[in-house]
């Protein structure tokens, strides 16, 4: 075989005289690394480069034994930041993912030179070319440097567009003015809060427009006005097989709630970066487990109950899978575990409620106390068991009777009654349904209840239930 051809050297190195000191490799600017090629990915992806920056955020691996952090740090081009230029096209910030690197983690404010491979991290399964990713550097070496001018946070007065956020990726930013918590659905699981600029929450599309294309367009507008405040942890705090649940939440505590509608003010800069397919505000240090590091203050009060006319009080209450039939009695049924690794709720079973009698007693006690405290005359219930649909019983009202009995036992007398199921029910129902309960001394049902069946509800929602009521005008007569 022919001998292998010797690799050619770059022109600068090939012309170098023997014994001559070689020049240090040229530094590549962070903005050059962030310059996209095809799509949003860096044009230098998979190449090894060397760059210089100021450390603006640090997330050391193993900082907290109970929480998995981001395991890296963020750098920004020295002397950059300050006034936001909405027309800028590339970012001056970059995430450095330490991973298995044995290099020492620098501290916030350090000036460093990092040599490593350019990578794109999506953080979601089944990522496609359109999935938002994070440009990052996987380091081979990290060297202390000098002559780094400090960086300034870029002030933001709202949620930038996607292209603008791409040009601010991994940069230090300071959101200005007041923001509002518009969703906290993911707070208990991932420690995040969904924020929108201003003082008002965003409304669900179908509260404003009709379902369909108009609602889809409205939700897209809402998404463009929303960004999550993260906690720099990737731990699922509800996974009790891990130990994240033992740590304090970043933005939530007893006596200090983070309710939808509460206002948020940023007191410290954060990093704008892409995580799990979307942009987020990331604190410069892990705040999960360390709430004193929070970059925000949260203020708000629950609005007072409005004064309204009328003498009949109607309420709605989601009993969250109230099942008097228990998972422990269903063959093969497993459960979701609590922090003590005991089954509490059914998992992938015909039933969906409490797994054990103790878990059911805990659930029932809370629901009974809440409904009796609300003190409504009529309560529409959601997510109460339908034993017929699950095949457990022929008594469609079995769980409903159980709840009413518990309410009356707590009240000390026969205060509550339930509206019986109508004689005609849909052939295809879910194992949870809707129901009505009412106070017998205040109101009475008129005729039978009616379930409005339609194929549109099958597999998507519970069929609506309607019941006419009339108030009882005195102790002995209905009027």
Regions from the PLM with identified roles:
Residues 285-433, 471-473, 477:
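N-terminal, active-site-proximal structural segment of metallo-dependent hydrolase catalytic domains
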Residues 39-44, 60-65, 121-126, 378-383, ...:
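Surface-exposed patches in mature extracellular/periplasmic domains of secreted proteins
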Residues 59-61, 77-83, 234-236, 386-388, ...:
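Short regulatory "switch" loops immediately downstream of catalytic or recognition motifs
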Residues 270, 318, 379, 437, ...:
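Conserved hydrophobic/aromatic pocket- or pore-lining residues that grip, position, or stack substrates
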Residues 19-345, 363-365, 443, 452-463:
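Extended non-catalytic accessory segments flanking core domains
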Residues 2-26:
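Low-complexity, acidic Ser/Thr/Pro-rich repeat tracts that form intrinsically disordered stalk/linker regions
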Residues 428, 433-477:
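A well-ordered secondary-structure block
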């Amino acid at each position: 075989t022919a001998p292998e051809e010797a690799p050619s050297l770059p022109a600068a190195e090939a012309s170098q005289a023997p014994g001559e000191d070689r020049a240090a490799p040229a530094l590549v600017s962070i903005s050059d690394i962030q310059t996209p090629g095809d799509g949003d990915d860096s044009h230098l992806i998979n190449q090894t480069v060397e760059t210089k920056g100021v450390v603006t955020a640090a997330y050391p691996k193993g900082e907290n034994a109970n929480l998995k952090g981001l395991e890296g740090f963020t750098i920004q081009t020295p002397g950059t930041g300050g006034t936001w230029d909405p027309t800028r096209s590339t970012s001056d910030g970059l995430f450095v993912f330490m991973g298995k690197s044995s290099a020492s983690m620098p501290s916030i404010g350090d000036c460093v030179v990092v040599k490593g491979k350019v990578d794109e991290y999506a953080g979601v399964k089944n990522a496609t070319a359109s999935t938002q990713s994070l440009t990052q550097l996987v380091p081979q070496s990290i060297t202390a440097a000098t002559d780094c001018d400090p960086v300034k946070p870029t002030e933001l007065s709202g949620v930038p567009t996607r292209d603008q956020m791409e040009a601010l990726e991994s940069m230090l930013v300071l959101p200005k003015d007041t923001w509002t918590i518009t969703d906290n659905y993911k707070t208990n699981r991932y420690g995040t809060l969904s924020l929108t600029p201003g003082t008002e929450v965003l409304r669900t599309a179908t509260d404003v427009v009709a379902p369909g294309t108009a609602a889809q367009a409205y939700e897209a507008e809402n998404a463009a006005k929303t960004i999550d405040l993260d906690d720099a942890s990737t731990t699922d705090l509800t996974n009790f097989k891990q130990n994240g649940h033992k740590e304090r939440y970043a933005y939530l505590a007893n006596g200090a709630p983070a309710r939808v509608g509460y206002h948020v003010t940023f007191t410290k800069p954060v990093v704008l970066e892409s995580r799990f397919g979307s942009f987020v505000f990331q604190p410069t240090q892990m705040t999960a487990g360390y709430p004193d590091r929070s970059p925000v203050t949260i203020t708000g009060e629950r609005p007072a109950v409005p004064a309204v006319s009328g003498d009949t009080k109607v309420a709605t209450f989601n009993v969250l899978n109230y099942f008097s039939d228990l998972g422990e009695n269903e063959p093969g049924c497993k459960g979701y575990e609590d922090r003590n690794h005991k089954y509490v709720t059914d998992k992938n079973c015909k039933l969906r409620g409490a797994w054990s009698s103790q878990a059911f007693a805990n659930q029932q006690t809370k629901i009974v106390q809440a409904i009796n405290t609300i003190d409504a005359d009529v309560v529409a219930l959601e997510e109460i068991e339908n034993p017929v649909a699950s095949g457990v019983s022929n008594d469609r009202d079995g769980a409903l009777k159980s709840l009413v009995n518990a309410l009356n036992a707590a009240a000390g007398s026969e205060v509550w009654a339930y509206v019986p199921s109508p004689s005609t029910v849909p052939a295809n129902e879910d194992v949870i349904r809707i129901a009505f309960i009412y106070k017998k001394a205040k109101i009475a049902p008129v005729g039978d209840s009616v379930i409005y069946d339609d194929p549109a509800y099958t597999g998507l929602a519970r069929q609506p239930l309607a019941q006419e009521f009339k108030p009882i005008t005195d102790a002995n007569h209905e009027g």
